[in-house]
């Protein structure tokens, strides 16, 4: 059993499980999907965003992303976004869930040496809803390129500007003590799969 947030499960983990089953069809993988901290406590494996700080706990780094500004081509055309200065004035979608510790627009612009954005704001506490809102032209959204790659590849969202920042932390897989040999095999595969 593996626990992850809705966004991580939908955008990254579920496609990986499909690939894993092609190699290991006899191993059952169950997901516990929750955006509430602590709801994945009975899992063999859990995925976390941040730097692990617990001593004696086994973790594997999955990846560390770059954070990019995303929107639709219609949104980019309507707000004439080709440079950061235009993005500062455009409507922005903010992920307001404190549990994630994700980078905010204010953090993103500051890391690039720009002031806080001045455009209209839309706040949401679920990253999947934030991504859907961006696809519906509500505003621009920050994207972790390892998570949102499929949305960009399918043309549902595009990079609005060339600038990006490295994510301050990565995504890690926690291997709980109760993890079975099959769960560990899955963990090893996840940590090394492309």
Model-identified regions with their sequence ranges:
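Central regulatory/effector-binding core of bacterial HTH transcription factors
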Residues: 1-55
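Acidic, Gly/Pro-rich loop/turn segments at junctions of secondary structure
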Residues: 32-101, 106-117, 121
